């Protein structure tokens, strides 16, 4: 029972585009923004208004807060947004959500999240850093990946690698299509090496989240009490199956 409860507490901020590619026939990137447990297909947690939402492309940031549209998912507040790409190159969409109070863990949670969309085959800037307090720097280009490919990254905190950082990994299990034989399969866990570098082979086509978790500063919860906090640096990566020619 204790293990099941612990496994259920793996929160992930979703920032999912309709595709990891944008081009002449698909200039508009639609983003789905939900705070939930992706592998167990819920439950969904209430989101406050994000602190920051934008896109990094060509070394410059664009504030996209005005594009956020509030919606309800399973009765909880979530968001969506659309962005029309204007130039070739990798677009790093990012969000700094409002701190979330998790009573079961007695801590505030902030998961700084990003996803990379390649526009018009530009393929430059996929490892650009947003500058979050904790962030994963990809060593593997985070798109154009086949199922079974290995994703590698470095966990960074305030610009420095985090030795032996813990990374939680979950699959976006839409509709609960993947059966979970035991709670241990819900959230995969890997540790970075002494240089903050980690690797994971993605066994199924779809979206995968990599969440590097570190202890954050003391914060105040909704009741005004001083509590611990958890900072997460997340990146979403999609892999696809190889399909034979028809």
Regions inferred by a protein language model and the residue ranges of each:
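Short, acidic Ser/Thr/Gly-rich low-complexity loop/linker segments typical of extracellular
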Residues: 176-195
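N-terminal signal peptide c-region/cleavage motif recognized by signal peptidases
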Residues: 5-7
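Short, aromatic- and glycine-rich surface loops/edge beta-strands on solvent-exposed regions
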Residues: 87-101, 208-214
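Beta-strand-rich domain onsets/edges
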Residues: 11-30, 106-165, 171-175, 225-246
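Short flexible loop/turn segments that cap and initiate beta-strands
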Residues: 43-52, 160-168
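Short, surface-exposed beta-strand/beta-hairpin micro-motifs centered on an aromatic residue
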Residues: 80-83, 195-201
